[in-house]
Amino acid sequence: MSVNFSLEGKVALVTGASYGIGFAIASGMAKAGATIVFNDIKQELVDKGLAAYKEAGIDAHGYVCDVTNEEQVNAMVAQIAKDVAPIDILVNNAGIIKRIPMCDMTAAEFRQVIDVDLNAPFIVSKAVIPSMIERGHGKIINICSMMSELGRETVSAYAAAKGGLKMLTRNICSEYGQYNIQCNGIGPGYIETPQTAPLRERQADGSRHPFDQFICTKT
């Protein structure tokens, strides 16, 4: 992959980047010259990620951290500044999805998705912004999903969280643009990752709803 920009000298934290979209984003940033830092919730996932980065020729730094836990996030951000350097770029990539019809979903399951997909980006962004303000620059990228704009059966919690993340993105721009902090949201479509495996299996025979029934759009 060729890149036409440079991230030399920049430290990029990509949350949940042991595999999948996060790993691909971090790998692309590394090729542009960034120093890559990532986290995952379990040591085994961090180790798996470190091995994958090493195989790709990338010298990444991995940390075990639950991004829904504010104390752990603050400690991780402080440790990254000590071990590597302050964070210049944050990619809020970590996320989960529960494919359950809304009326079958428990309130606890709904809250868990909101916690990981919306509260965690708030917590991590809040942790890195003060240092960005001090240094006069910063970049935050939120992985919002096309579900921040569209609805679909069985993903009520995920769509609600990603819709909230889209508005959090806009609010960060409004509050912190004056400090030369940019915040953007990206809405990927369906990408072949472990998270979308159940959907691909369900549609493997090619049978699916017609598009106009499959997705509810704004009218």
Question: Language-model segments: what does each one mean?
Answer:
Residues I100-C103, L150-S156, Q178-Y179:
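Active-site loop immediately N-terminal to the catalytic Tyr-X3-Lys motif
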Residues P101-M102, E109-I114, F211:
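Substrate-binding pocket helix/loop in short-chain dehydrogenase/reductase
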Residues S125, A161, T169:
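Active-site helix of classical SDR
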Residues P130, S174-Q178:
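Alpha-helical segment proximal to the catalytic Tyr-Lys
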Residues S145:
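Residue(s) in the substrate-gating loop at a strand-loop-helix junction
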